[in-house]
Amino acid sequence: FGKGSTTKAAAMAQMIHSGDPTQWPADGPNDNGKYLPIPMYGEVKVSKLAYAVSIPDINMKRMLARIDIANSVSNFTVEEVYLVNYNNAGYLSPVWDANGVVDIASGDLNIPVANDKKVGIDPANYHLVAGNTPYVGNIYTFEASAAVDDAGGNDGAASRKDAVCLIVGGRRTGETSTTYYRVDFTQTGKTGEDVEYLPSLRNHKYIISITEVSGPGYDDKQKALESYTVMSNLKMRLITYDRDKIKDVVYDGQYMLGV
C-alpha cells in the first residue's frame, strides 16, 4: 500500500484470507491442539487518536460461518462428517462501497472472485465425530453463495451438485457398516422445486439437527455426494441465525428460543 496513493477501497480489496490448511483448526478433537483465531472486522470513526479521546465500542464481525451438528435420533450414531464444495478464501470485511465505507450490519455476501473453491470428496474437510453429538464449534467455513436450482439438470458450478454441503457418515442400531447421507443447506419445510437453498453467511451459525433416519444411506461418499436429486433417508432441521443479533439459543428438537 502507498501512503496517500492507495484508497481505502483498494486496500479493502486486498484483505483476503485464504485457508491454510484448508480445514480451519479450532482446537477440536481432530486438530491435534492447533487453533487459528478467526479473523474479525470492525471499524469506528474518531475525531483523532489521543489520550483524552474516548473510543466507543467497536462491533466486530467474524468472517467465517460456523456449522454445528445435533442428533436427536436414539438409534443413529454420527461417526464422521465431511464439509464438501466449500470456498477456501474470503474477504476479511463485509461489503463496502466505492469509497471504502463498510456496512458492518449488511447481510450481503462478500466473496472474492478468486475464492479457491474446493469441489468434490478428495479435498473435503474431514471431522471424526465418533458419536460425540452435539458436535459444536469445530466446523468453520468461508462465505459461499446459495445453490441455484435450475430444475433442468444443469450441473454447473453454481448448481445444486456443487453446492456447499455435508456428507454425514453413520450407523443405525444393528448396522455393521457406515453409510453416507448428503445434507444440503436448505430452507426447512419446502420440497421439490420449491426448495430454497441458503448461502453460507459470515458470522452466522448453522445448526444441522438430525430428526429422523428412516433407512441406510449410500455405501460410498461419492455416491452420497451425487444424490442431490434423490430424497434422503436422513431428515434434518436447519437452524440458522446471525450471532450478532442472537446470542443464546435453546432448541428442544422442535422449537427454538433465541435471546
Write out the residue ranges for each language-model feature.
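Tryptophan-paired
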Residues: 1-6, 57, 66-204, 209-212, ...
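Extracellular beta-sheet/turn segments enriched in Thr/Pro/Gly and aliphatic residues
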Residues: 10-62, 70-72, 191-258
